[in-house]
């Protein structure tokens, strides 16, 4: 399918993105399932792939997932790479058969990313604003908690704050924290 690109063959991904642009795509987002499990640091190979893909005129944004923890957000020439969005639709809670006491607390962290994409008078399309909302997975209920948006009463506030601090400490300065007011 045209929305699915090949597994980390950088030149093939770039070729597929170029094909998408020739076919009418105005903004290409590359989704990569990658990263060392439970590592908040991006690897040298991830950084190399990010640099190669974002140097292409056909790749506009990278969103990574797979490490089960938050990984940094990089901004290169007004293009973004979210190396890892953490856990949102999955978690490592364990169960009666497979306890997960070895899973780091950071596997409960995730984020919702937001990118404002604008078209300029010259026809150029790019990200003009970007932000995130940190999330936390309650291992007892499997509930996704958007931090600062909707926090249940049955959750320890200290757990939420630790998650929020871990997330902001990893992603860096290139993505601003979105704040919602009631």
Identify what each model region corresponds to.
Residues 1-182:
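Acidic, metal/ion-coordinating pockets
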